[in-house]
């Protein structure tokens, strides 16, 4: 990843991808795994940074950047952009039932939900395989959804092919709706997010069928919940069919997705792994509180131990993905304390929140588009230019 020694990852990628459920790697946190998790976090963070959330924009709900410029423009590192290329965007309909309002910008019939990327040839050399990444976007306003969350569980048999299982797996209605809803009248959501992603994964698996491959699904907050469902679907329905292609989800601040039946199914699916990064004071991974079960392996962090952050902090800080990555960078496990083990800029934690101590002189919520997307033309008049269009320049 952007902060990983390439040779180490290339040689150990199956171990780092969870082949042995990360045994012996979490406490103390393995250096290569630490960097790898942060790298996948950066791929998830890019979805938040690129999303047009301003309701007054005619492009609200879209991605600011085209596919070919995405990783470069969404503030991902140069190294990271060189390791992956985005091959597809995917969308979900804004009318999905049971979806918390903060997940969507409601003035569009569909919302951009994330992207599919694949390792470049340089990425293959650095990562040891052709990694396919599915990155899900999180919420628009991260915390407001908690007050209105619908905890209804519904059958997942239609997605996971789990008919006849006992207990039958059930999942959160809202997460399932985001994943499976479609709108024939929509330009972008004629197919569900599930179908859009499945089609692209099938295409990439066929294109690289003679290579060693992996699939990694990443997300933060509600995006992590849908990523969990997505990863289970990929394995349950054999989309990783070419050879032994492992599927791993890296989920930051993930709310619970399903019941004990879903956990049983998840645990039984071959080649499926999930690393659940949880910040101890963050309440989101503890929701919904009843009737649901955790899946995967937990990587605990505690940003309250960081000497860089204001104390005691607040829920917005504890839930922030940038703060999560800061926590991963400095986590010391059971021995306690906090020490940055990788060179990750502490200014990043203030990108969207007010977390850093005043002595670092970094303004809170500093990540704003220059002039709010307004550009002055040759005629001296200002015009909103906050959207490049999805189509890559090479396709135009």
From Swiss-Prot:
Subcellular location: Cytoplasm
GO biological process: lipid catabolic process
Domain of life: Eukaryota
Transmembrane segments: none
InterPro entries: AB_hydrolase_fold (IPR029058), Fungal_lipase-type (IPR002921), PLA (IPR033556)
Gene Ontology CC terms: cytoplasm
GO molecular function: phospholipase A1 activity
Top enzyme class: hydrolase
Enzyme Commission numbers on file: 3.1.1.-
Role, per record: Acylhydrolase that catalyzes the hydrolysis of phospholipids at the sn-1 position.
Family the entry assigns: Belongs to the AB hydrolase superfamily. Lipase family.
Name listed for the protein in its UniProt record: Phospholipase A1-II 4
